[in-house]
Amino acid sequence: AIAVPFIVNPVEYSYTSNNLSEAINYPLDLEPLYNPVDSGKCEIPKVDLRRGKHVLAILSLSCSHCRVAAKKFRLIKQNNPGIPIYFILNGDTASYRPFITDTKANNIPSSQCAGRTFIKLASMQLPRIYYLDNSIVVKKVDYFELSQYNIEDWLNTGKAK
């Protein structure tokens, strides 16, 4: 009887941070965003993500899990506009408007990026969500774990949970 909830609603291990590489406290090379090799395919970020604390979400406009993450981020940003969230988006220009219409995440600054620069940042897992402190990856989370409280706690104490 105790196992019934897990049988009826199994944990999706393919989308939990348990499957993210546990490596943290390493510098994320953001330089390609500011000096992209494929400059025609990458919009330079509107803020300097290399300095200060940021929650960086790397999303695809066509990925359903990325849309869930964007919707959660919209609510987090709506509840606390001071949280420094930034999106790096991948997809064709025609997909941007439907993404924003669906997620209503137009309250979050973003840049579009494609090609090698995007692949280098995202790898093969989307959405990719990092807590960054001066370009150092302090924590990686998946969209299931997005928590306004945890982000605010990290911003205030410097300790990521």
Locations of regions flagged by a protein language model:
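Short, internal strand/loop/helix patches
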Residues: 103-128
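Short active-site neighborhood of thiol/selenol oxidoreductases, capturing the structured segment around
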Residues: 45-67
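Conserved segment of the thioredoxin-like fold in thiol-based oxidoreductases
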Residues: 78-112
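Non-catalytic, surface beta->alpha helical segment in thiol-disulfide oxidoreductase systems
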Residues: 120, 124-126, 130-161
